Each structure stands twice: as C-alpha cells, then as structure tokens.
Amino acid sequence: MKLDGRRESTNVDDRRGMGGGAKVGLGGIGGLLIAGLIYLLTGQAVDPSQLTGPMDSGQARTEFTQEEQELASFAKKILAGTEDIWTAYFSQYGLGNYVSPTMVLYTGSTQSGCGTGQSSMGPFYCSADQCLYIDLSFFTSMKRQLGADGDFAYAYVIAHEVGHHVQNLLGTLGKAHQQMAKMNAADA
C-alpha cells in the first residue's frame, strides 16, 4: 500500500511508553474478529482459544524502534484517510459534520472511557469517549499467530474500529448492542 506523501492524522493520543508494557495476545473479541476474518479470506478455521498470547509486564519506554515508528506513522495515515473519506461522505449525504475519533496508541494497558483497555482485548472502540484504542503490537501478533501480515490487514483493523465510531455517530451502534443483548438473553 503506497502511502508516501499522505498526511498523518493529528487526532492521535500516543500513550506508548506511559506504562502497561504487556505483550499483546489475540484474546477476547479481537481474537474472534480476526479468526473470522482469516476464515473468510482463506477458508481455514482458526480456534480463537489458541490466539491468546502471554502477558508479560515490562518497563515503560519513550524510545521506539524504526519499525515501531513506521507502524505508528502508517496507523496515523490510515486514520487520516478515514477522516477524509467520512468527512466527504457525511457532507455529500447531508449527515452533518463528521466528528473524527481519536486514536489512542498504547502499550499493555490504558484507561478508556469504557474502563481499562488491555492489549489482550485487541483493538477496540469506546463510544463513551469516542476513541479507538490500539496497541500496535497487535499487528505483530496477527502476523505471528495468524499469518495475517501486510498493510491491507492492518488498515482493515483500523477502518473496522472507525466503522464502530461511524455507527455511534449515526445512532446505530447502541441499537446493534441492544440486538446482541436480546440474542444473548434468548440463548440463556
């Protein structure tokens, strides 16, 4: 994916190096989503219970490798692309002004408007603070544990979380959660 010359979003709260320091695993909803994506793309079933990686506390860092810097830049450029597209779409279809989410980059764990976010949860969107949260080491886990490597797979994850933000802005996210709760209650 060629992103040279593309702008980086400024709607980013970079909390990497501020604590947490855990290795990411693909457990929880993130693991299920990625397992489903791999199945759709390859036809191979993946057991989500095997996607959980070990948690390992570490020290906070303020310096990042070249690869980590490039990955953060990539994520900011993908977010900027979603901002441009959704701003134009909202304008074109009379949906009002598009309010961009903030992307929070973190390592290990961080506080969100929805409680404590942990790497093992995978990337997530919190409607309470209109932020999407991602520990960039999730992409390393995607590559290592699922073979899902490359810019398009990484961009998909970010765009997916932005999609939840759009659902929230349009008022459909809450409705979807209500439907899921009804379905879960029916199964109980």
Residue ranges and their predicted role:
Residues 6-17, 23-24, 28-188:
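A Zn2+-metalloprotease active-site environment signal
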